Amino acid sequence: MERRQSICPQGRLPFYSAVVRSTSDIQASVRFASRHNLRLVIKNTGHDSAGRSSAPHSFQIHTSLLQNISLHKNFIARGSTTGRGPAVTLGAGVMQWQAYVHGAKNGYTILGGECPTVGAIGGFLQGGGVSSIHSFTRGLAVDQVLEYQVVSAKGDLITANEDNNQDLFWALKGGGGGTFGVVTEATVRVFSDDPVTVTSTKIEAAAANVLFWKEGVHELLRLLQRFNNLHVAGQLVISAPTKDSLQAGLELHFANLTDETQAIQLLRSEARALETHGISASTSVRVQRKASSELRMKPDLYPPHYGILEASVLISAATFHANDGPALIASKLSGLTLKPNDILFTSNLGGRVSENTAIEIALHPAWREAAQLVTLVRVVEPSIEGKLSALNDLTARDVPILYSIDPAAKISYRNLGDPQEKEFQARYWGADNYARLAATKAAWDPSHLFMTSLGVGSEVWDAEGICRKRRGFRAKASSLIGM
């Protein structure tokens, strides 16, 4: 019988997938993977452009059917006798839109993102969690976590909160998903689903018009800076409708305001005219009686035909709020060439994100000093060559431009980071936090059953997590982060 010759029989798709329906299913799957020394990956919705929820020759645990939602009037964590206030427990498979709909029916909302099909407690939450509307006034998603239920590498069900397994609880608040165990459910704070009035200022110009960036984007960033100082959050989105045009839109979120006239008057009192620069501008306003409606009706970020690549950078409050901050940022961003369907957007940090210093999280300490997160989304051509070219361009050309905005820091967001980031330990967590995460990883998963690309401990494995490198994990990690 002739032997088949196949170099890559199934690409990065797992050979097998356990579509779990219960915690006991997850425990059995983890023990099976450990017993047979399988390359294990965890997947819910798969919203990860770096491929962390898939791997070649792997065994996948698919959590999308864990759909439980339980609302608590006054949640008491296990091991505690003190109530922590209103909260909701979400199963691993619950998506953002499902949490928003359940909340809207029951008079609450959670701190979630604007992409409705992202999982609420998977990589989004465990990686940090940013909300374009709520982070400025409430903080990060990980600031809201009260408790995790986790299946460990041994297959045990573990409770992680402020009273139990505190090291694991801390690591899961920004250390990344699929790295320390399988989170089966998480309990997070909820808050009232208050109204919000959203103003939208849109500009458009020819791609060749350099004043689009120098005057138009500069002005929108100046407005964002000004309204942040007035305690109003916002988001700037820049795109290319065609290869010959550019557009940008600034949405400002006036929390607990339902007066359209007042919102427009506030905006117009601060805005400067742009039409004289060959830039068309328009303004609109809408009132949402529930803020969750603004989030759950957002379109999905992913194009229907193929995939995307992402890169991101934090902008410090010192840079953003400097007198020349908006002009500097606009000038740097103008170096990015946007193609149709590419997106460049900001996410408002600062505010409560900076104030929540009493809450320990595993993210880089610079998050507490940042004003904005800037993310670039590149649409990938539907071919292997197209993806490789786009990936190399992202790393070699786009990321250096993003990092040049705040060159002394160069901090990125793992959930939206360059898939080829070489200094991920320093970019995502910093030396001290990475050392602590490495110790937690060694304690809870010494055999590295759980491993993700650019995750804690991944530096001792090859790119696909199949072959271990010779040097020990702690020694390798220490050398990389300069400990």
From Swiss-Prot:
One of its GO terms (biological process) is indole alkaloid biosynthetic process. InterPro entries: BBE (IPR012951), FAD-bd_PCMH (IPR016166), FAD-bd_PCMH-like_sf (IPR036318), FAD-bd_PCMH_sub2 (IPR016169), FAD-linked_Oxidoreductase (IPR050416), Oxid_FAD_bind_N (IPR006094). The keyword Flavoprotein applies. The keyword Oxidoreductase applies. One of its GO terms (molecular function) is oxidoreductase activity. Keywords: Alkaloid metabolism, FAD, Flavoprotein, Oxidoreductase. It holds the Pfam family BBE. Its EC number is 1.-.-.-. Its cofactor is FAD. Disruption phenotype: Abolishes the production of clavine alkaloids but also of more complex alkaloids such as ergopeptines. Accumulates N-methyl-dimethylallyltryptophan (Me-DMAT) and traces of dimethylallyltryptophan (DMAT). Pathway: Alkaloid biosynthesis; ergot alkaloid biosynthesis. Residues 10-193 form the FAD-binding PCMH-type domain. It comes from the Eukaryota. FAD-linked oxidoreductase; part of the gene cluster that mediates the biosynthesis of fungal ergot alkaloid. DmaW catalyzes the first step of ergot alkaloid biosynthesis by condensing dimethylallyl diphosphate (DMAP) and tryptophan to form 4-dimethylallyl-L-tryptophan. The second step is catalyzed by the methyltransferase easF that methylates 4-dimethylallyl-L-tryptophan in the presence of S-adenosyl-L-methionine, resulting in the formation of 4-dimethylallyl-L-abrine. Belongs to the oxygen-dependent FAD-linked oxidoreductase family. This is FAD-linked oxidoreductase easE. It comes from Claviceps purpurea (strain 20.1) (Ergot fungus).
